[in-house]
Structures are given as C-alpha cells and as structure tokens.
Amino acid sequence: MLHIFRGTPALSNFRLNQLFSGFQQDNLPIVSCYAEFLHFAHLSEALTEIEREKLEELLRYGPTQKSQEPYGECFVVIPRIGTISSWASKATDIAHNCDLNKVLRLERGIAYYFKFNRTLTAEEEQQLVFRIYDPMMESIVRSPQEAAVLFEQHDPKPFTTVDILTGGHVALEKANVTLGLALAKDEIDYLVENFTALGRNPTDVELYMFAQANSEHCRHKIFNADWIIDGKKQDKSLFKMIKNTFEKTPDYVLSAYKDNAAVMEGSKVGRFFPDQDGQYRYHQEDTHILMKVETHNHPTAISPFPGAATGSGGEIRDEGATGRGAKPKAGLVGFSVSNLCIPNFPQPWENALSKPSRIASALDIMIEGPLGGAAFNNEFGRPALLGYFRTYEEKVNSFNGEEVRGYHKPIMLAGGIGNIRHEHVQKGEIPVGAKLIVLGGAAMNIGLGGGAASSMASGKSKEDLDFASVQRDNPEMERRCQEVIDRCWQLGSENPILFIHDVGAGGLSNAMPELVHDGGRGGRFELRKILCDEKGMSPLEIWCNESQERYVLAVSPEKLPLFEAICQRERASFAVIGEATEQQQLTLQDSHFNNNPIDLPMNILLGKTPKMIRDVKSAKVNNPQLDQSMIQIKEALFRVLRLPAVAEKTFLITIGDRSVTGMVARDQMVGPWQVPVADCAVTTASLDSYHGEAMSIGERTPVALLDFAASARLAVAESITNIAATDIGDIRRIKLSANWMAAAGHGGEDAGLYEAVKAIGEELCPQLGLTIPVGKDSMSMKTTWQEEGYQKSVTAPLSVIISAFARVEDVRKTVTPQLRMDKGDSRLLLIDLGEGKNRLGATALAQVYKQLGDVPADVVNVSLLKGFFNAMQALVKQEKLLAYHDRSDGGLIVTLAEMAFAGHCGISIDISALGDNDLGVLFNEELGAVIQVKESDLKAVRAVLTEHGLIHLTKELGIVTADDHIEITRSTRVLLSEKRSVLRGIWAELTHQMQRLRDNPDCADQEFEMKKDPNDKGLSAYLTYDLNEKITAPYIQKGTKPRIAILREQGVNSHYEMAAAFDRAGFNAIDVHMSDLQKGRHHLQDFNALVACGGFSYGDVLGAGGGWAKSILFNTALRDQFSAFFHRQDTLALGVCNGCQMLSNLAEIIPGTENWGRFVRNKSERFEARVAMVRINNTHSVWFDGMAGSHMPIAVSHGEGRIEFKHDQQLQALKAQNLIAAQYIDSQLNPTEIYPANPNGSAEGITALSNSNGRVAIMMPHPERVFRAVNNSWYPENWQEDGAWMRLFQNARVALG
C-alpha cells in the first residue's frame, strides 16, 4: 500500500534562480517552475487516523515556505529505481522509533511542475531533465503515482554459469567483456585450467569474486610485477623498493603492509571513554597512531558526490578496522582535476577541451565532490583538517611529443589518522568455529564491480558498468558501526573482536575471503543470512555489491552475546552469516535455491595467480626554456593568485567540520582573520594532554612531465617542509603514505613510475631516515573516448601524493604562517634549499602562461634538507620563530603574500641577494621556507642555522609593516607595489566564484567584501571573569559529584568532548543512549542534569534534531520521562548544536520556552564550519552566570542553525524577557546578520537562548569543543589550560551546589 504526502517547497528563491539560469542557457521555453517535496509511505496496512496525523507531523520539517497548488507538466525526481536511498533508511528508522510500525519504508522525491510557452522537443526534454536530476543516483517519473515502482519486490534470481568445459577460453573471454571482469589473458588461462581440473563450470559469482579479489585495484599487480626496462631486468619490484624504506628505518613502526592501515608509536596519555558502568573516565595508556590514505578516482569521475563521500567513508572504515578495532580521528581530502572553466570567470591558461559524456566535468567534480567528502566526514564526526587542490590540463611537449595531459580522470584523495590501543595493534587468530559477521547496512544492488572498474582506463568499461559501480553513502550508519567498534576495543582484553576488515571494493566477495584467509582459515557461509533490502537480487549481486558502511568480523562463539548486546544498544545492524572452517575452502550456500553459488578452494581464489612482467621502454623529454619575454611581474602575480593550486580554498574548507572531537589544535584556518594557509594539521593525542599528532601533504605532479624522479622527491620533501614547524623531534618519527597514480601502458610512464619509486624508495627516504609503511596505487589514469569519428585521450601526469604523519611532543609549539605585529621589531629570512638555482620548469608561473619550461626544481642536497628539518625543530623547541611558511606553488612571492594575508599587515622586501632574474627569484618553486624572527633573536637563530650547515643559504628579505601594502624591490628599483587588500581580493576570487555557483550568492558576496576590507579587526576576546579562577573548587571538595546524562541518539558524534568538559567541571558524566531510556536501562529521574549533544541524529533527516525530538514526543513513556525531568526544580539541561535543535523541538514540554524558535537551514544553504565571535548577554541563565558582557570566539559547525519564529512577537518577547543568552557579533563587536560573522543568518545574530527560570539553555555553537585553550583555532596568548568556555560548564556545577 502506497500513500503520498505533499511536503514543503523544495527550492529557495536563489536555487530557483540558479535553475532558471541553466534553462536560459539551454534556451528552453519555460514560463514558470514550482518544486515541492513528496513523501512516499510504503505501508503494510492502512493507517489509523491517529497514526496518519502522527506521520504527517513527522513529515513536517524544514524552513517555513509558502506552498502553492501545483499546475503544469510534472516531472518527479525519485531515488534511482532499484535502490533505497540513505534518506529512506534514516526516515524509516525514525518512523519505527515513533511506533509507526506499519511503515515499511519512507522515500522522498521532488515534484517539478513546469509551464511552457510551447511544446518541448525530445531534445529539449532531455536538456530539462538533465538540469533537475543525477542519472547516477536518481530516476525521473512523470507523475507521483508512478513512484510506486520504487517499492516493487521481485523474486530472487539464481546464479548462472559460464560453460568453459565446452566453450573453453572463448566462453570466458565473452564473459570477461559482458561482466566487466577486467581479466588479463593469463588470468583467463589460469581460470580455465583450474576449473577444468575441478571438472565443473564456474558460476558467475565465482568469476566476479575472482575478478574483484585479483583486480589491479585489490592485488596491486603492477607494484608486485617483475620489471624489464630498456631490455634490462630490474632487481626489485616497486613494492620491494617501497618496503626498503622500512628495512632501512623500522624505528617507531608497529605495523606495516599487512593491515588496513599502518601503525606507529604514539604517546602515553589519558584516553577518555565510558567504562562498562557507563561513566566516562580517563585511562592512562599507550595510544598509538594509525595512518591511511586512499584514492577513489573512478567513482568520483562518474558521480562526484557519492564517489567522494564513499571515498572518505571507505578510508574511515580502513582506520576503524585496523588491528582488532581502532578509532578514526582526523581526516584529509585532496583533488586533482582538469581546468575548471568557471562560467563568466575565464582564465588565460584555460582551453575548453572536450570530454566524454559519461564522466563529470572538472567544475562539477569540484562543486559536488568536496561536498560529498565533507558531508561524510561531518556526519561521521571526523574533522577534515588538511587537503590539496590542483588543476592541470594542457597540450604540452612531454615524453611522447605533443599531447594533452590533465586530470579528466580525477584524483580524489581521502586519508587520515586515528588511534589504537597497544594490545589491539595486531589482529588475533581466528579459531575454527568462530562466527563470521557482517556489521552495518543491508546489501543493495549498487556499487557492483568497483574494484575491476577502477582498474580500467576510463573509457574501457561500458557505460552501464560505470553506472553499476556508483556507490551510495550513509555516514550515520557508519557512525553507529564505529560506536560498536569503540565499545569493543574499550573493553580491553575482553574485546570480542578477534579479526576485522572493512567491506570495500568487491563487497563481501573480497572482504570475507580476505578475512578468513588472513586468519588462516576457510569459511562456510549462508547467502540468505546476509541482510538484504532488495529481495530480487541474484547471488552475484548479494555477494559482490559494494553497499557501503559495512565491516566483516570474526567473533568467538562465547563472546557473541556480548557483541549482539552492544550492536542492539547502538542500533547497528549485523548478521552472523557463517563460521570459520579448518578446511581451506570457501563455500557459499543458498538455502532458497538449495545450491552453492561458491564452492572453491582458497588457493584458487587467492593463490599464485600468474605474476605480471612489465617489459617497458624509457623516454626522454626535450622541452624549450620558459619564454619570459612577455611576462610582467604584476600580471604574473595576479594570474598565479587565481590558479587553483595557489588560490584561496575557503570554499573547500568551511564545508567541513574542523572542531569535532575537541582535539583539534591546528586546522587550515590561521590567526584572527582565519586565513587558510596552515602548512599542516595538528591534533592533541587526548583531551588531557599536549602530546599529539601532525599530518601534512606534499605533491608536485606537473614536474613529472619533465622529470619523474624530481616530482617524487619534491613530494616527499614538501611533506617535510610542511610539517617542519611543529614539535616532532627526530625525523625518523615521521612516517609517509605514498599514493601513486599513473597511466600504465602509456609511452614512457611505466619506466617513469619505476624511476620515481626508486628515487624515493631506494634513495631519498633511506637517506633522510623516512619510512613509507602504507600507500595505494591507481594505475589507470588515462581517459579515452570517440568524438566525431576521432579517438581522443587525456592522460594524467605521473602523480605521487605524499602524506606525512608524525607524533608531536607539544602541540602548543606549532608555528603558523601568520606574520606577527605584536612582538616588536622583526626580520623575514629565506632559507633557500634550492641554492640559488631558481628553476622555473613546471611551475605555477609556467602553467598560467600555458608553458612547461625545461628544468624543474628538485632536491639539491639531501643532507641540507635533513639539516633544515633539524634546524626548524631546534628553533621550534626554543620558541624562536614568530612565523613560518614553506615555499611551494607560486614561489617566494606567494609565500610572502600568504603570510601577509594571515597577519593582516604589509611587508617590505628586497630580493637583491637572491639572484639576477626577477621572475626566477620570485616565482621559482625550489624547496625552502620564510621565517619571521625577532630582531633580538637573530643572533641565536643564525647560530642554529650555522650549526646545521644552512647559514650560507639564509638570506635576509626585509621587514613586516603595519600597513596595507606589499612592496618588493631590487635595491632601489620597485618591482611590485600593491595594496595587500587588493591582492587578498584576487587570491579570494576563485572561492568567491565557486561559492556563488554552489551556495547562496548573497552570502558569497558578503564574505568576499569582508576579505577585502583593510579595516576588518578579525577575532578578539574580552572576558568579564577570571579565566583561571577555580569557582568549582568548594563544591568539588565536598566529595560528591552530580550525575549528568551525556545524552546521544544514533548519529550524535560530539559526546566524548562534551563528557570531558563536564567531567573537568566536577560531574560524573554518564553515557546515555536513547535506546537506554527506551529499554529502561537508564531513567532521567536518576540524573541531576542532562546535555543533548551535537552531531547528526538520524543524519538530519526530517529536520535537524526533529526526528530525535519526535521520537520522544510520539512515545508516551519517553515524553512523560522528559517532561518530568524538565519540570523538576533541581535539574539543569543544555542542548548544543543538534541537541539545541532537538530541545527546541521539545519546547512544548519545557517550561518557560513558549517563545523559542526552531532552527532551520542556514541562509547560505550550506553546512558552515567557522570560528565566530559571540557576545554573552545579561540573562537569568545559570549556565552563563557571571559571563555577561564578555565576547570570545567559538567553534560553529552546523547546516541548520538559522532561528525561525512563528511570528515576530516571539522575537520581541525573547528580548523583553532577556532570554537571548548570546549573539553573533562582527569585528566591531556589534550583533550582526552579515555572513560569515553570522554563519547562519539568524535574526539579530541569535545563537543561544535560555528558558525563563534559567535552568535550561540551548545554543548552536560548540563550547565543548573549545573548553581547552589549545583547541581554539585562535586564542589570546595569555590563556593557559582552560579556554573561555570552560566557565559555562563550571557554572553548571556551581548551580547544583
């Protein structure tokens, strides 16, 4: 039974305007358009009137917009037929938690109603639907009733076989094409031989499983191959050269090359988590660091948002599935694409070269892909703190003569760090009889063949196979799974997880064989035990689909009840689908058809398949020098500042949460003006320590068009110069991930790959003492297609991306690029590791003038590079550096400009001592760094540089000036004289243009104007209370602690830092899941206070916090329990972010809240992660007692934080009753509605409210993430351990006596 509920208008005015702009570009005869949400309820039986009203109320969410009666021709966009959207999964969960159990499934679509001034042609109709839906993720039907196709169920399909006993090689070769297996000829021979020996035909499931498990993507055949180059056999494989770094420098590495991530030694700190009694406590223990970096290039090319989202999601699962369970902590994301070609923003280096229709454009990838990666990290609850973005697309004379090189097949990099207990670093043994479990979401017919598909050059696979390999993301489900893993590893020696892997490429067909094989066992499985959302799937589709957010585990039978209880509490789906066997055989039984889709010896599936031999020839390049004759410095700088690799990247940063965990010490944004120029990311190891972790990225991929080895060396070196200004100590503490992207088989590239791997694996890294314990390769970076009868291709440069990871001794000592004006007289020094060579080949300067040049930068002297790192470490330890920024893309002139942008100051520079060629001096990208040093410290700094052999490379540049001017001279000749604010505006143009295309253009314009304002004062802080006064001391000395419920729902992700803040204030912080209240394991009558934590309950489906609130309001027992708690006179309640949204939806049961508004989508219509300033007002709130008149920065991370009132009188009443506890203010300290000082557009900057008796408070920003000073992106130097917001938690402790 299907019931359709109309929803609110789906598009805001500016979204409609954007849509109409596209229609106008296509010359479509559209007079009007109206779009509204439709909700489709698939019911087991008819609803009662009460149930119908409840469901209607549940489906009422979002900003209030005036609906209209639809008219015109209807086009309904629904989830792709045959799939179940992640929205549906979460909305259905909410319905069931509201006791609406007749709802089998909820889905959502958008109905578009168009009025035309004439009938559309078939081509015009295609243009129209292309503007309103994504064919990879959605379908179009022509009426709401036709959406019933979403809920059709089909009978299960049987497996098929390939008749090789009769047809031999020919039959398998045909199946290789139709199934998209990407099998090589020797693999076909291998399979025919083995199945002939078994005396039977292979099933399609077995072939698909073999193809995925043995794809280049999964088995890394090229990196394990034997090599012959120019007729000479090479001694080592690529992988052996990488492993050489570990053989030479095994120091501090605990696990390498054998798990989902590598592990290195960390610090002994207090890890904070709840014990089995539910109380959060610190646990002093060795907390090691895990690291992993993946790529997800093919899916991102086909469908950017889910491709990038599942790229981040898969890498997060890799971290969680390390050892016997670990905790992901902080992430990185990177993109390489072809030229953007932004409409109305043409750049002189861009040509509108063509592309195949099946892949997304570079612009679409950079609009949708970053949103996907950010959305997954945000919803999972992992801060994304680091990244890179490069564009390249040019016809160049390289190793094969003139050809187009670029990133039509993009690079989507996803990586990060996590933590793991010492006892869980190594995986356990799998005993015979161990239960084999799939943890996570149900199987769906999506993401088929991703491993094999990503192993082909783009264009080799059929478009329908590309379509099938697109995946779907549900980060809230992955968060639930991670909570299960966390509960398990937190049990220490009682951890029920013996073995764990994530489910990625190839689905269960790769994950389960890998699990049992690594555990030395076989496995017997029952197909129909696998959770499935689509009953008509074939065995191949069930076993091989790549439905995301899944893990496979081995659990001993006696620990199974414990594991089940943990899963049920976290509402994480799981299924016991088999058990480990002594016999090395993989058997998959199908009880529905009473047959075995798989019955295969493990040694055939994962045995000695034929080893690849790469017999290749090297190539040389002979390119002319960079023609400098027509290049002027000012115009060159303007161009370079607009080049995406150099330009400001705020549009990629503020979409990502950078404060969740409460352990972020250095994000991308630097200083009071929050300028995105940080060289590295830094986290604290725990919530009670200054030890930590750092990570950085190095990449110089265009250099590979001239010199493969130099490109690899520079990537390693840049990762070091980026991380050098944090307190690491021994360079051997740094561990690298190497991600290799190449167009294998393209002339010269294979030999170039070998040359690059050798350059760092055999030479540079061993010489520096660096280890590469982890990495990934993608060997199909070429796009080919037919166009008007011609064969076309675009080939990516050989691309090595290096990510560096290190333990940090003291995170407070990290030095940023922000030039300081508050430290007296100072000097700027350049440490030139290029030794004056000033080479310009493959630089940003060359790129913006559509050239390549001849000789690129390179590592000149390895010992000096090592000496440079050691010198910086000494200066960091001694706190002799005021600012530090490495030289990279754009050269010295960009390094200096970015430092001035961060410091909101001017500079006066003389380059006389740096060489004779002005362009070479200013725009070369040789290794090096600029440091700012106090004049009084110059002698001591020079002594350190002398000690490390660098003094002859150190040149004094000039001074910092307290004005809005950047001046560069050669002695008395002025080379550049320009306002800093003008250059700052040019640097920001790319972000401005991308934000206008993607977000609310009014908001984009407001932020752009703010960046150019020389009078912007940036962030500041003024406190009306003593930050260091221990106001809770008298109460803590009593020896009793009030109990606070740290309340969370599925998808909440900020509970650890919240608990830590209350624990520090003197509370017993107790972990309380909503399922505990539902099942009676906890009751609110046992608590003195509750806090509803931030995150994404139910993934913000049905309105942020709305589903959580309605699961309380529509459950009589829970409603009564919460109402009783709020009406007690001895309790306190706080709601932060998602908890704020939730409590605002509970206002009807909270006394004194009749004028509260509710929180809806931000004005920008984008998730906003910012550091904003707020002012505390004078109210009755006990939470803000003594803080009135203060203003200070605070972390903001939300997508729905704009307050909306039913009527204006509510706002006036709040003001009259003094219930507005805090407001966003601008740099002039006035309440503001201007973006981004007000990140969500709330009226009068409202961001916190109190109820009338002062005991309940709600606020959208996150005080719990910045209760320690060190976790503020910027804070005054006189702040010590506690941050300004610790007082809020202390006030609560005082209020309870």
Swiss-Prot record:
It catalyses: N(2)-formyl-N(1)-(5-phospho-beta-D-ribosyl)glycinamide + L-glutamine + ATP + H2O = 2-formamido-N(1)-(5-O-phospho-beta-D-ribosyl)acetamidine + L-glutamate + ADP + phosphate + H(+). Keywords: ATP-binding, Cytoplasm, Glutamine amidotransferase, Ligase, Magnesium, Metal-binding, Nucleotide-binding, Purine biosynthesis. ATP binds at residues 307-318, 678, 888. GO terms for molecular function: ATP binding; metal ion binding; phosphoribosylformylglycinamidine synthase activity. Its EC number is 6.3.5.3. One of its GO terms (biological process) is 'de novo' IMP biosynthetic process. Pathway: Purine metabolism; IMP biosynthesis via de novo pathway; 5-amino-1-(5-phospho-D-ribosyl)imidazole from N(2)-formyl-N(1)-(5-phospho-D-ribosyl)glycinamide: step 1/2. The keyword Cell membrane does not apply. Mg(2+) binds at residues 679, 718, 722, 886. In the N-terminal section; belongs to the FGAMS family. Phosphoribosylformylglycinamidine synthase involved in the purines biosynthetic pathway. Catalyzes the ATP-dependent conversion of formylglycinamide ribonucleotide (FGAR) and glutamine to yield formylglycinamidine ribonucleotide (FGAM) and glutamate. Monomer. This is Phosphoribosylformylglycinamidine synthase. It comes from Histophilus somni (strain 129Pt).
